[in-house]
Structure formats: C-alpha cells, structure tokens
C-alpha cells in the first residue's frame, strides 16, 4: 500500500513538472511573430557570464544585438541555442552580437546542459540566477528573444522558439546588419532604462 502511494505521488509530481514545462515553454515562432518591439528604450543588462566576465549591454553599441532568454529545462531552447550558434558563426565578421541569458539556474547546471547537448557557443552565456533581468525585460515565457539595432534601440521581440539561421529570418537579420548600417551611423544610443528590478 505504501509502495503504491509513493508510486502515485511520483507520477503526480512528474506529471505536474512536465505540464509546467510545457506551459512555460513557448511554441515555435514563425517569422511573422518577430514583432516590432515598440519600447523607446531597453532595460539595463549587466550580468556575469559562464567564463566569469561581466558583460554589459551598453558595451555592445555599434552591433546588432540579440538578447536571448532561456533555461536548461526548456525543450525548444536547446535547438534554438544551436540555431543561434550557427547564426553567430555565419555573421562572425559582421557587427553582430548574441547575449544568451539563462534564467534562475546555477552556472554549473548550464555548463553541464551545454556539454550534454553538444552546444558549443561562441557568444556569452550570462547567468540571471535571481531572475532580476527576466523581470526587468518583461519575459513571460521561455524562450524569449529581443533584437536591438546598432544604436541599441528596440527593434523586434519574439516569444517562442525561432530558427534564426534560415530564411526569411536570416535575410531580415542580414539586412539589419548590412543595409541599415549607414542609417544608424552616428545615431545616439537609445537610453538604457535604469537598473534591473
């Protein structure tokens, strides 16, 4: 009787954990879900990366920037991190940066996750252990990504997983990196909102 009760409890807990991960993980997004991000300024972002360095968003000025929020338990996040890695490799010679932000987990867990899933990233992976950045940026589901232009002004937001290195998304990114470079030349950076809540 006790064994059956324990089995039932484990099954219920497992089901609840699975349901929570499904609800909190956004479905795969399409190009039309890369919606204009209408804020006039972006929140502050300064976090410690897995290599121990402090990475500040303001230092990325002059680059098109993708700020990508994820977690190791988020199933769609795994493929999206690999997609972002392919995009980073393809655009390595251009003014383009990716900042991946893990939400609510210790660095060791993130390192194991990346190794286990053979995700070799050439962009900083930042740790938002207390979820302050997640709250400041208004992240409601994972994955969520924000695209900033080269003056660090809000450009696009997408809630849900996206395949970044295929068209039409790839063409949109390349256009912003190359064709619009002249239009942001000398443009004053958008004001970064005050500290993270």
Predicted regions and their residues:
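Bacterial N-terminal signal peptides that target proteins for export
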Residues: 2-16
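Bacterial N-terminal signal peptides
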Residues: 13-25
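Short pre-active-site segment immediately N-terminal to redox-active cysteine/selenocysteine motifs
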Residues: 63-65, 69-73, 141
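Conserved redox-active cysteine motifs that mediate thiol-disulfide chemistry
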Residues: 69-86
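Short, internal strand/loop/helix patches
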Residues: 99, 114-151
